[in-house]
Amino acid sequence: MSKQLEIEFEPPFEDEKLSPKYWNVPFVDEVQEFNDMMGKPNNYEPTIPKEWEWKFVYDFIMEELEEYKEACEKGDIVGVLDALCDITYVSLGNGTLVHGLKGKIWKAYQEVQASNMSKSCATKEEAEETVRVRSEEKKHKCHYEQVGDRYIVYRTRDHKVMKSINYFKPNLKQFFTDEELRQTTGS
């Protein structure tokens, strides 16, 4: 088992002079070590690499998604675990390293998690207002249910979670400098 998974993760960030190459990022570190051993590239600055580099990651993720689907269809829980580990390895590990995002991935992940959690409602009143707004907006009947100390609004016909009126989109742009954005978008 990875040593960094056994400790609380607290990497250095913008104010640190240490290169992201040396940050401890669970899952990414193991792939970095593998790539170093195999002579494969690791990027440490945000980049859109050559097409063959990102296509390798894309194709590998798609292959593993297919293996996941096949394992589920067969009822093969070991195959499911294998596919999920491979998906994580390729997407979080290789994807992060091929795009030079090691120094950004953890804070970005936390931002996405906070955004996802904002889909729930803190109060009954917020849930009731969310039901009203989402029902009008989407023209679908909605209802809410209390789950623990939160309220979740669902579309009634299929139980799809509807976003709270206080939902916020993750702001991932905040993790890039203007220069990094210019260099990677061509603008």
Residue ranges and their predicted role:
Residues 2-187:
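Flexible "arm" and connector segments at domain edges
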